[in-house]
Curated annotation (Swiss-Prot):
Topology of the protein relative to the lipid bilayer: Multi-pass membrane protein
Catalyzed chemical reaction(s): a ubiquinone + n Na(+)(in) + NADH + H(+) = a ubiquinol + n Na(+)(out) + NAD(+)
Source lineage: Bacteria, Pseudomonadati, Chlamydiota, Chlamydiia, Chlamydiales
Name of the coding gene: nqrD
Protein name: Na(+)-translocating NADH-quinone reductase subunit D
Task of the protein: NQR complex catalyzes the reduction of ubiquinone-1 to ubiquinol by two successive reactions, coupled with the transport of Na(+) ions from the cytoplasm to the periplasm. NqrA to NqrE are probably involved in the second step, the conversion of ubisemiquinone to ubiquinol.
Enzyme class: translocase
């Protein structure tokens, strides 16, 4: 497999052509909780990129020394190690965001993308391609989260990255009862699934049109 693909392909393919949330429909559950604001979406995307890239690298590095009978346990231990590292890093240097994300950083270990890349690719290719694939899979997951979070934060709160984009004077008040009001549905968890569904639908249309050419 490694001989047939360049490093560039290993990195670029998961960003779009084999994007895990949009193509494989993996890792979408966390979109419910972490896409309310762009800050949390970026943080979760980077955290998953770190865990997936590093765990894929070490799964690949140890692939020849790991018996098939214990490979899943070994992969889980490796993934858990890097989840703990990123969790402690966020608590030490980005406590506010860590508190906002709460248990969802720890739940990265249950993210299907992380185990999926380790099992389907990392144990079959050398460490560098495995790392590039894992890193890009996390980044591909990240940009999907950020896209969803931009829509949710803008319409739900009128902000992006905490910056007020919709002027306060536009909002409804006692003197202007007919003014703008935030779209409350976007703050609710189901809105993330609606937006992801629209994105998946759009990607499938683009892929089908490309296939017909």
């Amino acid at each position: 497999m490694a001989a047939n693909k360049s490093y560039k392909s290993y990195f670029l393919d998961p960003l779009w052509g084999n994007n895990q949330p949009l193509i494989a429909i993996l890792g979408i559950c966390s979109a419910l909780a972490v896409t309310t604001t762009v800050n949390t979406a970026i943080t979760m995307g980077l955290a998953v990129s770190f865990v997936t890239g590093c765990s894929s690298f070490f799964v690949s590095l140890l692939r020849k020394a790991t018996p098939d009978s214990v490979r899943m346990i070994t992969q889980l231990i490796i993934i858990s190690l890097f989840v703990i590292v990123i969790d402690q890093f966020l608590k030490a240097f980005f406590f506010t965001i860590s508190k906002t994300l709460s248990v969802f950083v720890g739940l990265i270990i249950t993210n299907c993308i992380v185990m999926g890349r380790a099992e389907s690719l990392a144990r079959n290719v050398p460490p560098i391609p495995a790392f590039l694939d894992g890193l890009a899979s996390g980044l591909g997951y990240g940009w999907v989260l950020v896209t969803v979070s931009i829509v949710r934060e803008f319409f739900g709160f009128g902000t992006i990255l905490g910056l007020q984009l919709i002027p306060k004077c536009f909002y409804a008040s006692e003197t202007h009862p007919d003014g703008y009001e935030n779209f409350g549905l976007m703050v609710l968890a189901p809105s993330a699934f609606f937006l992801l569904g629209i994105m998946i639908w759009g990607v499938n249309i683009l892929r089908s049109k490309k296939a017909k050419r």
